[in-house]
Amino acid sequence: MRNTIDRFLGKLHNEDIYLIHGDMWHFDYFKQRMPNNVIDCGIQEPNIVNIASGIASQNKTVFVYGVSGMIIHRAYEQIKLNVKGWAENKGKIIFINSGHNGCYTDAGRGHLIDDDIALCNALNIETYTPTSSGG
């Protein structure tokens, strides 16, 4: 999925699109084209959401890449207040890698969170779950 997102965003070459991730690396294609639009926050999920919300409030599109369940659980209050508050109508924040999809089975139970979609639904956040990365 990372390579697909990296190529997709890199080909768009759009200054209004940002990628924020939590220590996920492998976004070289997009980063080469838009070095100021890729932000690695490390494993600080609440900060990832706060930064994404601030950028989205400036009418930018923000892709948040990480283990979605970790982001949803660790930053739920920020999502509830920021994403569903002032940022939702000014920009779009797109969380990637939702649901227990098998991507991180070797990383242990902490990476296999299966209720992130239900938590998003509780906040009336639209969720889409494609079955493949498209190559």
For each predicted feature, which ranges?
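Thiamine diphosphate
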Residues: 1-135
